[in-house]
């Protein structure tokens, strides 16, 4: 697959603009709520540390009064483009969300445009490469009850290359996702998600159909006295792999 298609392969699995690890159907939960934060929080710093590496990634987030992200600044020590800045613009009348991500030298890395339907579900998503102008489009079709969706991804020529079937809980969080790669014409992988009573992801299982193996992810969460998430630990196949810390900025 081309680089942008490679990016979208992972994008479909985290397509709904949150910092969580799961597809989110409608915006019944705001970006702030998905992160486990209360309504009073306006700015946070996220620190992600991989256990087997000294380098860590730091992300600064700003929210509007509705809990939607308006700005994201990423200091990524583990990648070539170390500083990325994303601006989010909302048009409530047109039901759209525009996100533009820039590199540290000011050049546009990519642009994401999401369009919502009358029920506030993501209906169409377009990802444009800022350098090559290559475009990927994902269209979502929902069941009558909104608990299932089929997402189809096409390239700039209109050729279908990926299909994702997603099942949701009443909160709009994915509980199951099946991905099919058109080129192989085969079921590629299935992912299952489990949440706690707060809506936080606590378990994720990735089943790779081709390789016939399962990768297990377990998530533990710690909260402060105000109810804001302050730490998340991610275990992969039983071993602690990532520690994510949240610091509230005044």
Language-model-detected regions and their locations in the chain:
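Buried hydrophobic residues that stabilize the cores of well-folded domains
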Residues: 20-250
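C-terminal motif of bacterial Sec signal peptides marking the signal peptidase cleavage site
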Residues: 15-18
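Bacterial N-terminal signal peptides that target proteins for export
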Residues: 1-8
């Amino acid at each position: 697959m081309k680089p942008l298609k490679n990016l979208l392969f992972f994008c479909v699995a985290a397509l709904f603009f949150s910092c969580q690890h799961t597809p989110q159907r409608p915006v019944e939960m705001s970006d702030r709520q998905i992160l486990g934060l209360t309504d009073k929080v306006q700015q946070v710093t996220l620190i992600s540390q991989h256990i087997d590496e000294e380098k860590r990634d730091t992300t600064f987030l700003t929210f509007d009064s509705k809990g939607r992200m308006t700005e994201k600044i990423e200091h990524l020590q583990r990648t070539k483009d170390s500083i990325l800045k994303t601006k989010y613009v909302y048009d409530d009348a047109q039901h759209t969300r525009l996100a533009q991500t820039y590199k540290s030298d000011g050049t546009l890395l990519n642009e994401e445009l999401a369009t919502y339907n009358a029920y506030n579900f993501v209906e169409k998503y377009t990802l444009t490469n800022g350098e090559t102008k290559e475009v990927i489009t994902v269209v979502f079709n929902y069941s009558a009850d909104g608990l299932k969706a089929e997402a189809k991804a096409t390239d700039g020529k209109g050729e279908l290359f990926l299909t994702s079937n997603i099942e949701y809980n009443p909160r709009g969080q994915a509980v199951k996702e099946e991905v099919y790669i058109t080129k192989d014409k085969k079921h590629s992988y299935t992912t299952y998600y489990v949440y706690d009573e707060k809506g936080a992801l606590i378990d994720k299982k990735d089943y790779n159909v081709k390789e016939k193996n399962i990768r297990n992810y377990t998530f533990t969460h710690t909260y402060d006295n105000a109810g804001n998430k302050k730490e998340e630990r991610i275990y992969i196949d039983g071993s602690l792999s990532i520690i994510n810390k949240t610091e509230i900025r005044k």
